Amino acid sequence: MKRRTLDILFSIGGLGLAGLLVVVGMVFTSNANFANDYVKTQLSQQNITFKPLNTLTAEEKAKPGLVKYAGQKLTTGKQAEVYANEFIGLHLESTAGGKTYAELGTVQTDLRTQLAEAQKAGAANVADLQKQLADVTAQRETVFKGETLRGLLLTSYGFSEMGAKAAQAATVAYSAAALLLLLSLAGLIHAYRTPKTVAFAAPEIERKVPALV
């Protein structure tokens, strides 16, 4: 095979791959834009704003994310992660001794059992048990709302991270396409400069030296 023909074939193949990588990059870019726009739209509709810096408590000021985004409206996945973990998470820890919704359910069930037994026995601590049950019920409702919102915000953060990964993949695809384009153009230039008669890896013909008599 002629060297020029081989260069042209490889160059055309490289251009084809470069075009394919551009298409792949466009798909990744489209997915990244969709994820970012979707997250921004959904979070903006919630109308959540970080507390201003001068209203943060000492515990809240110890959270770098709350200080960084103080007073800002929540519109990005990263902000959603900070609000979920550093703000809601902090307040959930201080509610009901850090117990979860499921753990408070166990406490609530136990108190109901104790209250029923106390009422049957006519015990003197019925009012106290009723107050404890009311407090735990209120705490459990608060924790449920907090955990639900926290879960939704973390889901938005995860979706935004998928968009970020897609954007990174698009950058890699575009970079690889650019590299292949340059190599293909270099191959075409080399093919243009190579004479048509030059063969690729042509075998050397052994010279026969006449024997001396």
Functional labels for PLM-detected ranges:
Residues 1-18, 141, 145-152, 156-161, ...:
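N-terminal pre-first-transmembrane soluble regions of secretory-pathway and organelle membrane proteins
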Residues 22, 26, 137, 141, ...:
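Polytopic transmembrane helical bundles with strong interfacial aromatic enrichment
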Residues 1-38, 175, 192:
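Hydrophobic secretory-pathway targeting helix
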Residues 38-45, 200-206:
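Juxtamembrane extracytosolic/periplasmic "stalk" immediately C-terminal to the first targeting helix
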Residues 48-147:
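Long, solvent-exposed extracytoplasmic domains/loops
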Residues 127-178:
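Short, aromatic-rich amphipathic segments at membrane interfaces
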Residues 2-12, 162-213:
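Juxtamembrane interface at the cytosolic side of transmembrane helices
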